[in-house]
Amino acid sequence: MRKLFRQIALSLVAAVAVVSAPARAADPSGEEIVKRSLEAFYYAGNDIRAKVQMKLINPQGQVREREMTMLRINLGKSGDQRYYIFFHGPADVKGTSFLVWKYPGKDSDRWIYVPALKLVKRIAADDKRSSFVGSDFTYEDVSGRNLQDETHALVRKEELGGRPAYVVESKPKTVIDYSRRLSWIDSERWLPLKEEYFDARNQPLRTFTADKVEQTGKQWTVMARSMKNLQSAHRTEVVYQAMEYDIGLKQDIFTERYLRDAPAQWVR
């Protein structure tokens, strides 16, 4: 009998230990990881102003440069955003400006002003994955894609460059220029560290890398990034030389009026 009581007591202790042991948090879903990454990468702060240098490098190592100012504002909790980009140089693109009205769940509205023609051109939704001013980034890369346009699955967890990362596979729901994308997303800062794009034959197409990440105030920011076309060997490097958050931008800056006449206070 004493032995029986002892066995019962040990069983109760074991049961209590199991119940009281801290539960290990489940990993977030692939969709939740990508959602948080889009928020960290494209929505940090209420607004931003950034001085940006872009280098377009061909396979022979020849370089073309672009200098621009980027403005962005978030419009409340709806997820709507406005982007404005003004090109300071070189001469062939000086005065060109680019405007995006972004809406979660549907196609963004995009316009570009070409000063040589004094023309504001609307960019068709089908062109959102075409090259942004001759670079290896697309218009969609600049302002972000819709979460619902792809399915997302967590593949594994691993370190990349000393940072803990989730590896997520995303597949477009419709036929587009790539068949799938692998993303390495920092599991603490939620910024994308690397992305690999594959074409319809599952051959490597483009690779994005976050080359320099810094903390600006409260925000972690990818200050240098690059995109390489693996099939043409052309690559684009982008460096944010200055990044300011929460400077008090007004929504009326992001209109056609300022495509033609840049808001000097903000793009000087």
Locations of the language-model features?
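Bacterial N-terminal signal peptides that target proteins for export
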Residues: 1-12
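Residue-level signal for alpha-helical transmembrane segments in multi-pass membrane proteins
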Residues: 13-16, 20
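Sec/Tat signal peptide C-region and signal peptidase I cleavage site
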Residues: 21-26
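N-terminal mature ectodomain segment of secretory-pathway/periplasmic proteins
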Residues: 29-116, 153
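Gly/Pro-enriched, hydrophobic low-complexity segments
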Residues: 35, 88, 99-101, 109-113, ...
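Short, ordered beta-strand-loop transition motifs
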Residues: 74-81, 156-164, 215-217
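Surface-exposed beta-loop interaction hotspot
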Residues: 144-150, 157
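Short, low-complexity, Pro/Ser/Thr/Gly-rich segments in the mature regions of secreted, periplasmic
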Residues: 257-267
